[in-house]
A protein has these predicted regions:
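Short alpha-beta junction capping motif
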Residues: 37-82
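C-terminal substrate-binding/active-site "lid" region of AdoMet-derived donor-dependent transferases
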Residues: 76-99
Length: 159
């Protein structure tokens, strides 16, 4: 029997599972245009939001209870032009200087080494200043390991 897998679908299955469980979704655009929107929620579950504006970064990192479900969130600073419908990389991913990795110099960046662990055999949440982070990329749990998926979703609910 071959188990279904996917290669980095950028949190699509996680979003679908949380939506089916009744979690409210907010788009990046909504947060960027109205950063205070997050204040109405006791908990914010971040997916793989790698490219964010400064307004989004500040709104998310100032919320007291964020669950960073995927590593590599908040990695690069962008600017959005809603009139021209363009996104411009401002900082991060070795830009504008080679030594710049995280565009916000964020001390809680957990991209390396966790972004590429998609097996999640020893998946854990660990505490940060504003919430919790995972130590692996859990996307394939939504297809393969129902027991571990159940435990993950229960933990998200309880945090």
């Amino acid at each position: 029997l071959v188990q279904p897998t996917s290669e980095y679908t950028s949190r699509g299955k996680g979003h679908q599972a949380l939506t089916l469980l009744g979690y409210h979704s907010i788009t990046d655009v909504e947060i960027d245009k109205n950063p205070s929107i997050l204040q109405q929620f006791d908990k914010v579950v971040m997916l793989h939001n790698e490219y964010v504006t400064r307004a989004m970064f500040d709104a998310i990192t100032n919320h007291p209870n964020v669950i960073y479900l995927y590593p590599n969130a908040l990695y690069a600073e962008i600017e959005v032009n809603y009139v021209d419908q363009t996104i411009t990389l401002i900082r991060g991913h070795n830009y504008p200087e080679q030594e710049i990795t995280n565009g916000f110099d964020w001390p809680f960046d957990n991209t390396h080494p966790y972004e590429y662990d998609d097996i999640c055999l020893g998946m854990e949440f660990y505490k940060t200043k504003d919430g919790w982070m995972t130590n692996c990329y859990p996307e394939n749990l939504f297809l393969v390991d129902t027991e571990q998926l159940f435990n993950l979703l229960k933990l998200i609910k309880d945090l």
